[in-house]
């Protein structure tokens, strides 16, 4: 049974400031996100200190906007949740401090939420929901992991990247090609105009029986390819398309093995890269052909946001879990060690 409780959540793990309000019985009440893309564009990447300072400036405004959107007063909030890791320490500390200060001011309990658990559970916000147990593919700028998910909080890592995350690989390739920041979506857009068959690229670690990933060798291959090719627009588009095809095929091969290893029917794909249309199409096609099911977050929730944090907190409240009032943040935190204190 869904509980009628208003959860206000704070997200600040990287360069998106987020405040959301979620009620398990009534659904999404508010979701406010401010992206710092323009702030960091001139540097070609996220500057941690600038990110933390900008979060501090945005949170009061976003909170008021969220309360207005939800048509609630602050006194109607029952629980405060925040992202406590993993992420940039300064950015996390800004969000944690704001959350704890707010909780102290209105005398409400707090919940400390794992950022990637928020992503993992976000497909449950869509109308059609996965069923436990399922496989989770987490793909973002900082993570590439395959997990066995038996229940909320019961996560076993089946495989993960040994070097670059897939989102990081997209961004680095885009930067080498001179594409605007943020590069991942720009590379995917350029790939739509390219011939994905023109360049044959190595698919790292597909001949190994495990479920780990590696993208550094592919990145080096593409860098050398760019250096030896003409820099005309069509060649750039063809390289982008071939690179994207190679990454998608690599992820698909590992997901097939995870399906076979676990025997599960459902696959959940979350994180920023889950918005990639080529990846979605390939995984959906494979699932349809093999009588499996694949689930994605709504496109608006693929990036970092506070709604997924509030939503994850609602699952934790079902366990009657409330955290202490000590401010805790951590840059690294394995999902498989979620029950371990920070």
Swiss-Prot record:
Reaction(s) catalyzed by this protein?
L-threonylcarbamoyladenylate + adenosine(37) in tRNA = N(6)-L-threonylcarbamoyladenosine(37) in tRNA + AMP + H(+)
Q: Any idea which UniProt keywords this protein has?
A: Acyltransferase, Cytoplasm, Iron, Metal-binding, Transferase, tRNA processing
The main place the protein resides is: cytoplasm
Record note on cofactor: Binds 1 Fe(2+) ion per subunit.
Give a Pfam family name.
Answer: TsaD
The prosthetic group or cofactor this protein requires is: Fe(2+)
Residues bound to Fe cation are 115, 119, 304
EC assignment: the record states 2.3.1.234
InterPro entries on file = ATPase_NBD, Gcp-like_dom, KAE1/TsaD, TsaD
Q: Which EC main class describes this enzyme?
A: transferase
Q: Does the keyword ATP-binding apply?
A: no
Gene Ontology cellular component terms for the protein in this record: cytoplasm
**Any one GO MF annotation of this record:** N(6)-L-threonylcarbamoyladenine synthase activity
Which terms does the UniProt entry file under GO BP?
Answer: tRNA threonylcarbamoyladenosine modification
Sites binding substrate sit at 138-142, 171, 184, 276
**Where does the record place it?**
Cytoplasm
What does this chain do? Required for the formation of a threonylcarbamoyl group on adenosine at position 37 (t(6)A37) in tRNAs that read codons beginning with adenine. Is involved in the transfer of the threonylcarbamoyl moiety of threonylcarbamoyl-AMP (TC-AMP) to the N6 group of A37, together with TsaE and TsaB. TsaD likely plays a direct catalytic role in this reaction.
Q: What NCBIfam families does the record point to? A: gcp_kae1, T6A_TsaD_YgjD
What protein name applies here? tRNA N6-adenosine threonylcarbamoyltransferase
Organism for this UniProt entry: Dichelobacter nodosus (strain VCS1703A)
């Amino acid at each position: 049974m869904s509980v009628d409780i208003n959860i206000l959540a704070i997200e600040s793990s990287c360069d998106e400031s987020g405040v959301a309000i979620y009620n398990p019985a009534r659904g999404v009440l508010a979701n406010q996100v401010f992206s710092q893309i323009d702030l960091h564009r001139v540097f070609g990447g996220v500057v941690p200190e600038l990110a933390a300072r900008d979060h501090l400036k945005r949170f009061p405004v976003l909170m008021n906007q969220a309360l207005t959107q939800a048509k609630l007063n602050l006194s109607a909030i029952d629980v405060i949740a925040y992202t406590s890791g993993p992420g940039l320490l300064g950015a996390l500390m800004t969000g944690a401090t704001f959350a704890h200060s707010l909780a102290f001011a209105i005398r409400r309990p707090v919940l400390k939420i794992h950022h990637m658990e928020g992503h993992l559970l976000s497909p449950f916000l869509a109308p059609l929901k996965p069923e436990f147990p399922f496989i989770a593919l987490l793909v973002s700028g900082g993570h590439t992991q395959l997990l066995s998910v038996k229940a909320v909080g019961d996560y076993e890592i089946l495989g993960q990247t040994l070097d670059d995350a897939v989102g990081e690989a997209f961004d680095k390739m885009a930067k080498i090609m001179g594409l605007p920041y943020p590069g991942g979506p720009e590379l995917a857009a350029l790939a739509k105009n390219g011939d994905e068959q023109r360049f044959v690229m190595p698919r790292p670690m597909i001949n190994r029986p495990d479920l780990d990933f590696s993208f550094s060798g592919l990145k080096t291959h593409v860098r050398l390819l760019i250096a030896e090719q003409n820099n005309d627009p069509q060649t750039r588009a063809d390289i982008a398309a071939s690179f994207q095809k190679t990454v998608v095929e690599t992820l698909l091969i590992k997901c097939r093995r995870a399906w076979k290893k676990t025997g599960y029917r459902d696959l959940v794909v979350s994180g920023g890269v889950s918005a990639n249309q080529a990846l979605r199409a390939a995984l959906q096609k494979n699932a349809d052909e093999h009588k499996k099911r694949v689930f994605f977050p709504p496109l608006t929730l693929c990036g970092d946001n506070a709604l997924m944090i509030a939503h994850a907190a609602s699952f934790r409240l079902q366990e009657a879990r409330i955290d202490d009032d000590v401010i805790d943040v951590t840059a690294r935190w394995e999902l498989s060690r979620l029950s371990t204190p920070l």
